[in-house]
Design a protein with these regions (language model features):
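Short coil-to-helix segment of the ABC ATPase nucleotide-binding domain corresponding to the Q-loop/switch region
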Residues: 112-121
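Conserved ABC ATPase "signature" region
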Residues: 83-84, 127, 131-149
Length: 284
C-alpha cells in the first residue's frame, strides 16, 4: 500500500495550495542501527494547526528537533519559509530559532524563578524592551493562557496544568511565527486536558501562528488539529482533517484511535508473557 504524502491544505477560495511554512521531504534519520525516520514527507501551511500522533518511540520528538534545527538529518529536506535548515551556520541558526516558540511536556520552567520571570526570560534575551514593556507583555501573555494574578508565584506553587500554561505563555512571549507543542496534555486529568486544549485553540486563533503538536491523546488531537498526521515505523502513514481521519479505514489508524492491544501496530511489540496460572492453582 502506498503511503499518502499530502501537502498543505488547499486555499478554500482558489483551490490552490498555499506555499508551505514548513516543508519536509523524504526525511531520514538513524541512530546507529535503528532507523527512526524513514522517508517522512509532509508540509504545514501558514497558520495551520498540524497534530502528529503516533506511539512512543516512533520519532515524533525527533521530527520536531529537525524542524527547529537541533538535529541534522541523514538525508532529505527540511525547509522553513523556503530556507534549508541544515544549511544554516551557527549565527544563522540562532536567528532562525527566534521564529519558534516551544512548549515542553512538563513546562520546563526555572524552578527558582517566579512565573513572571519565567515568562519574561525570552523577552529579556530576544527583545529590546524596557522593564515596563516587558511587564506589560508578560501580563498580556498570562492573560492569554488564563493565569491572571499568578506572576509572583513559584512553579512549585502551581498545579501541573498551570505549569504547562506558564510554559505556553513563555513560548508565545516573543511573538514567534511557529509554535511547537511537545505532548502538552500528557499526565493531566480530562478536565485539565480540555482546558489546555481550549488555551491552545485560543492562542492559535489570536496569534495566527503555524502550530505543530505531537501527542498520544486522540481526543485532544481531534479538538485542536486542522489536520492530523500519523507517524508509524518511521513514515507518515496517514493524514487528513479530523473528521475524515476518524473515518480512515487503515487498520493501523483505527487501532491507534481506539487504543486496541491487538492489530498491525502490535507486530513490532515484544511478545506478551504467557498467561498466568489461575489463582489457587499453585502447588503447596
Amino acid at each position: 500500500m502506498s503511503e499518502p504524502q499530502q501537502s498543505a491544505r488547499p486555499d478554500a477560495r482558489s483551490g490552490a495550495r498555499p506555499k508551505a511554512k514548513i516543508h519536509i521531504a523524504d526525511l531520514r534519520k538513524s541512530f546507529g542501527p535503528k532507523t527512526v525516520l524513514d522517508g517522512v514527507s509532509i508540509d504545514v501551511a501558514p497558520a495551520e494547526s498540524l497534530v502528529i500522533i503516533g506511539g512512543s518511540g516512533t520519532g515524533k520528538s525527533v521530527l520536531l528537533k529537525h524542524i527547529i534545527g537541533l538535529l541534522k538529518q541523514d538525508s532529505g529536506t527540511v525547509e522553513v519559509d523556503g530556507t534549508a535548515v541544515e544549511k544554516l551556520g551557527n549565527r544563522e541558526i540562532t536567528e532562525f530559532r527566534r521564529k519558534f516558540g516551544m512548549a515542553f511536556q512538563e513546562g520546563a520552567l526555572f524552578d527558582s524563578m517566579s512565573v513572571w520571570k519565567n515568562v519574561a526570560f525570552p523577552l529579556q534575551r530576544l527583545k529590546k524592551l524596557s522593564h515596563g514593556e516587558i511587564r506589560e507583555r508578560v501580563e498580556e501573555c498570562l492573560t492569554m493562557v488564563r493565569l491572571e494574578g499568578v506572576g509572583e508565584k513559584l512553579p512549585s506553587q502551581l498545579s501541573g496544568g498551570m505549569r504547562r500554561r506558564v510554559g505556553f505563555a513563555r513560548a508565545v512571549a516573543h511573538e514567534p511565527e511557529i509554535l511547537l507543542f511537545d505532548e502538552p496534555t500528557t499526565g493531566l486529568d480530562p478536565v485539565t486536558t480540555a482546558l489546555i486544549d481550549e488555551v491552545i485553540l485560543d492562542l492559535n486563533d489570536r496569534l495566527k501562528t503555524t502550530t505543530v503538536t505531537i501527542t498520544h491523546d486522540m481526543e485532544s488531537a481531534f479538538r485542536i488539529g486542522d489536520r492530523i498526521a500519523m507517524l508509524a515505523r518511521g513514515k507518515i502513514i496517514a493524514e487528513a482533517p479530523p473528521e475524515e481521519f476518524r473515518r480512515l479505514e487503515d487498520p493501523r489508524v483505527q487501532q491507534f484511535i481506539h487504543g486496541r492491544a491487538d492489530g498491525p501496530l502490535s507486530e513490532d511489540a515484544p511478545p506478551r508473557e504467557s498467561q498466568r496460572e489461575p489463582r489457587g492453582s499453585e502447588t503447596s
